Amino acid sequence: MGTHRVKGAVLCGGTGSRLRPLTYYFQKTMIPIGLKQKPLLEYVIRLMKYHGVADVALLVNYKAEQIMNYFDDGTRFGVRLEYVHDDPNYRGNGGALLNASRRGVFSGFDDVLIYYGDILTNLDLTDMLRIHREKDAAATLALSTNYTVSVGVAEVAGTKIVSLREKPPLGKPVVIGVLAVKTEVLEILEELAKPQQELDIMQHFIPLLIERGYHVEGYLTDAFWYDVGSTERYEKLDPHVVDEALGFLLA
């Protein structure tokens, strides 16, 4: 990546309420995944390292000690890890990002690669960051083009069903929880921050960038991705599929 410096930021602070009862015992990013039963977060960190992002901040809160005990300073994984404990006064993933920015975690870096900690993907981060730089975008969001609706969809004429498709492709790209942001635009989070109020990256921060005319790029991909954010989704995740898509990270 030459002199262009990128820092990873993984959102690891959530309590994982939709993953209970697992998260009574595990931090949600530490739940075992795949045939080798490695923590979800290990796949995330190894993917970043694979694509040359070796400086990574883990934004932690709930059961942070599990993450810290397992990954330590990151040497074993070839990365430099920094732990940033969430400020309880600023809630939501946007609050966690603001807190890290205020502490100078991203100083000296041109971009921040933000990764939602309950997402599995083999997304080509190198290519996404290249597009982000070439387009000189304030933010670039990974968008999946292969999302399927989880229910049957009917096409109707009046009340008559003329076609029925079970779990069809959505037909529109969906946000998958990986994005690159210019470090300098993180200061806009300050305008949105209110103590004890939820601040969300996708709900508040990105829409404000768009509203103000900043260039927000979409990086379209058909890469494998999976949201492991609920017990139902976790139980449906085939470990063989994980190893097929992400096994190269553990080789």
Language-model regions: role of each:
Residues M1-V10, R18, L35-Y115, D127, ...:
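Conserved N-terminal catalytic core of the sugar/cofactor nucleotidyltransferase
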Residues T15, G117-I119:
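Active-site metal-binding loops of divalent metal-dependent hydrolases
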Residues Y24-T29:
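Short alpha-helical oligomerization interface
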Residues L41, I67, A100, D118, ...:
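Residue-level signal for inorganic ion chemistry
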Residues V53, F109, D136-A137, G213-Y214:
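Short, high-confidence coil segments that cap the C-terminus of an alpha-helix
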Residues L113, L120, L129-R133, N146-T148, ...:
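Catalytic-core segments of class I nucleotidyltransferases/pyrophosphorylases
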Residues K135-T145:
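A short, conserved acidic/glycine-rich loop-to-beta-strand motif
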Residues E155-K160:
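Short acidic-glycine loop/turn motifs at beta-strand connectors
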